[in-house]
């Protein structure tokens, strides 16, 4: 417990900052991931083969690739894409992307694949008879979505979204490759300096 002392005598300050970084990346990634998941679910449930194929391809590939590889691809590939776009507009200087932004996007891309499956299953759990009954009552699409579909999807999805939150929190231990110091990286740093676990 000596490591958790605040000030010069311990690592408490550093652990607190690293914990806040872990929570910040997790919360931002979960929010962005849910937004991407909603778009992915929409692409999967509409009657368009192309969007369904793209959404299924995205979720299958990202879930099948190791999370660390996804982070590397977005970290290094993101810089290359931004530099290429900048060169099109005549800007030839080096552009370095913010590590927090890259880490958030990478974890969100991973989180979105799992969240989309949870939300899609929750949507499919709703009886089609309820939607037909709402149409028979004269409700428009927006009313049906916000008054009939959304409350039930949220209720069905909450347990699964809790599991996705745990996956997202776990995956933040990989973001140290972008240069951010999160809780696991900070514990390794303190262990190496103190020569004790």
Task: For each feature predicted by the language model, list its residue ranges.
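Transmembrane alpha-helices and adjacent helix-loop boundaries
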Residues: 1-197
């Amino acid at each position: 417990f000596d490591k958790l002392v605040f000030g010069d005598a311990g690592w408490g300050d550093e652990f607190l900052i690293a914990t806040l970084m872990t929570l910040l990346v997790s919360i931002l990634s979960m929010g962005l991931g849910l937004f991407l998941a909603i778009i992915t679910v929409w692409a999967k449930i509409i009657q368009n083969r192309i969007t369904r194929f793209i959404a299924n391809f995205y979720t299958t590939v990202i879930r099948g690739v190791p999370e660390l590889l996804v982070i590397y691809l977005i970290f290094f590939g993101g810089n290359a894409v931004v530099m290429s776009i900048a060169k099109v507009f005549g800007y030839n200087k080096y552009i370095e992307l913010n590590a927090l932004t890259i880490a958030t996007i990478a974890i969100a891309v991973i989180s979105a694949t799992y969240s989309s499956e949870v939300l899609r299953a929750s949507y499919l759990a709703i009886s089609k008879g309820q939607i037909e009954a709402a149409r028979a009552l004269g409700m428009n699409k927006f009313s049906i979505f916000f008054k009939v579909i959304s409350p039930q999807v949220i209720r069905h999805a909450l347990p699964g979204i809790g599991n996705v939150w745990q996956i997202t929190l776990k995956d933040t231990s990989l973001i140290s490759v972008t240069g951010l110091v999160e809780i696991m990286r900070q514990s390794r740093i303190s262990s190496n300096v103190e020569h004790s676990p």
